[in-house]
Amino acid sequence: MGFHQIDERNQALLSKIALDDGHGENSPYFDGWKAYDNDPFHPENNPLGVIQMGLAENQLSFDMIVDWIRKHPEASICTPEGLERFKSIANFQDYHGLPEFRNAIANFMGKVRGGRVKFDPSRIVMGGGATGASETVIFCLADPGDAFLVPSPYYAGFDRDLKWRTRAQIIRVHCNGSNNFQVTKAALEIAYKKAQEANMKVKGVIITNPSNPLGTTYDRDTLKTLVTFVNQHDIHLICDEIYSATVFKAPTFTSIAEIVEQMEHCKKELIHILYSLSKDMGLPGFRVGIIYSYNDVVVRRARQMSSFGLVSSQTQHLLAAMLSDEDFVDKFLAENSKRVGERHARFTKELDKMGITCLNSNAGVFVWMDLRRLLKDQTFKAEMELWRVIINEVKLNVSPGSSFHVTEPGWFRVCFANMDDNTVDVALNRIHSFVENIDKKEDNTVAMPSKTRHRDNKLRLSFSFSGRRYDEGNVLNSPHTMSPHSPLVIAKN
């Protein structure tokens, strides 16, 4: 029996959650991971393999963290210098976490936001990464069948994180490219009315700020609009701020915490913040997720639920020491922002030379790339055809816009901070060759008689890579064999 097959006996024995497809494994977002898992690029061992550009990971400042750890061996209980605290740290810790860690996280969150707002350590709840923290908040706020309004495009993993086990629902707030995908009050009201017409109880709005996949930040007016909207409807606002330290140019990041403190008559108990060290520090493997809620009951219940996904005390101990080093934190935040900005500028500059534009962005570790001109027609079917060529022939794992529920075909999220400079060069060269090939085919097609043009329409999606000739019509779907390192096993943003 294959991995994806469930026989009749197991259908009777297993739960509905175990039997359904709520994980979202069949999304193109995860299909790209499967293609990478089966044929990963390596500059020497597999130079023609798939380059991972679907992983929103920040590896640009690892050297600074490694250098700090090397200089502070006492921060780890697994070194001779830190061994004296081994017993006290290795013993059972309560759900609150280590006090020094919560204090350090609160201070760090304040620094990331420019010191314009302070966070109360007693309101910090820890969870197993942003995925675990997100799900915990949904469990606290919603019953099965309740709905949340989420502006689209949104992070593809939300379909898993927010819905799968909680049985909550997502109602999309449709945003479009005509205003750079900004959220409007009108769009919120339309989505709210749609939920009411479907007899769905709306429990809140969920945003990611800075946005994944757009790489843009919400301005103050939009944040105030969101707060006013949830106050009027007496529903919750959950703000995922896990990319807040990746802002590399103006406008600066504005946290919902700042708006809450400034707005009069704000119902603070409706506001909740999700945070993590996965993106800002580049430590997704440490599985540090944070819930910061202004609601006392949510803090209490989320803390109790966190027993299902605690952060290890060893991890807390190490990070408490690191984040308490204010000189290091200041230097890290400044340098990391600089490096992300430089990589973004280099990447978008080279794309621009190829005639490829991206949404103007100021944050995140990815670009929202516009390939609409390469579609044979403006449909999501054409987007998927183009995506399969990029995955299987160009050998780049980029994520199609449809996996983020965008309303316009032809957009792709491309991550740029999870690789070294040499791999970036290889990726850019592949993109350049691909676009150049398409442009040549387009020129040839324009010169053909109309009947020939129609017959050879698929030439727009043909590509020659390393001596091999491909055509979209002959492309196989992405493989479905799951690697043990796949995000289908290890949740990743």
UniProtKB/Swiss-Prot annotation:
> What causes induction of this gene?
By wounding in fruit and etiolated hypocotyls. By indoleacetic acid (IAA)/benzyladenine/LiCl only in fruit tissue.
Provide one Gene Ontology biological process annotation: fruit ripening
- Name the cofactor(s) required for activity, per the record: pyridoxal 5'-phosphate
Which keywords belong to this entry? Answer: Ethylene biosynthesis, Fruit ripening, Lyase, Pyridoxal phosphate, S-adenosyl-L-methionine
Function in brief: Catalyzes the formation of 1-aminocyclopropane-1-carboxylate, a direct precursor of ethylene in higher plants.
Pathway listed for it? Alkene biosynthesis; ethylene biosynthesis via S-adenosyl-L-methionine; ethylene from S-adenosyl-L-methionine: step 1/2
Q: Know the name of this protein?
A: 1-aminocyclopropane-1-carboxylate synthase 1
Q: Which Pfam families match?
A: Aminotran_1_2
For this UniProt entry, which residues form the secretion signal?
Answer: none
Q: Which family does it belong to?
A: Belongs to the class-I pyridoxal-phosphate-dependent aminotransferase family.
A single GO molecular-function term is: 1-aminocyclopropane-1-carboxylate synthase activity
* Top-level EC class as recorded in UniProt: lyase
Q: Which reaction does it catalyse?
A: S-adenosyl-L-methionine = 1-aminocyclopropane-1-carboxylate + S-methyl-5'-thioadenosine + H(+)
> Can you state the subunit structure given in the record?
Homodimer.
Residues with the N6-(pyridoxal phosphate)lysine modification: K279
Origin organism is Cucurbita pepo
Q: Which SUPFAM superfamilies match?
A: PLP-dependent transferases
List its EC numbers: 4.4.1.14
